[in-house]
């Protein structure tokens, strides 16, 4: 992974297998591009923090302190501005959480903390802040680091089963 081009300092570091952004700064993205994939990722954030995972650099799955809130496309598990989870599975801040996200074409399934919250729905367009609008092309995984502290670990990307 590498820092996205920016005037800001790269604040990311790895310690004991945990990728950490201690404060707002640059986004981080893979050097490889992916078309159809399954992503497993675990994350933790402090109270009131906000991050996101951009699939192919174009579709943001929200990572935000949303414990106790009504489901929304702008809270944990939502595809920002487009798809609202059927349930809010957010844990309290400071607890490790997980996503298993499958993206095939523009169809996405999001499993948060072991429960499917978005099932095989079409993402209608790119999210604000996307790297580009070339939806038919492979793209990187981008971790948002410009909104607040966040930690990620146990990141795996595989080919989805048919």
Residue ranges and their predicted role:
Residues 1-162:
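Carbohydrate-interacting regions of secretory-pathway proteins
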């Amino acid at each position: 992974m590498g820092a996205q081009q920016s005037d800001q300092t790269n604040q990311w570091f790895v310690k004991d297998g945990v990728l950490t952004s201690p404060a707002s700064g640059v986004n981080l993205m893979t050097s490889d591009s992916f078309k159809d994939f399954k992503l497993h990722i675990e994350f933790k954030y402090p109270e009131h923090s906000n991050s996101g995972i951009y699939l192919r650099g174009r579709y943001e799955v929200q990572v935000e302190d949303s414990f106790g809130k009504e489901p929304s496309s702008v809270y944990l598990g939502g595809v920002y501005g487009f798809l609202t989870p059927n349930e809010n599975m957010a844990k309290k801040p400071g607890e490790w959480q997980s996503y298993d996200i499958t993206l095939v074409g523009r169809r996405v399934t999001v499993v948060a903390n072991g429960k499917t919250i978005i099932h095989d729905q079409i993402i209608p367009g790119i999210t604000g802040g996307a790297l580009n609008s070339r939806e038919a092309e492979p793209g990187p995984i981008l971790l948002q680091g410009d909104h607040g502290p966040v930690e990620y670990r146990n990141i795996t990307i595989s080919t989805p089963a048919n």
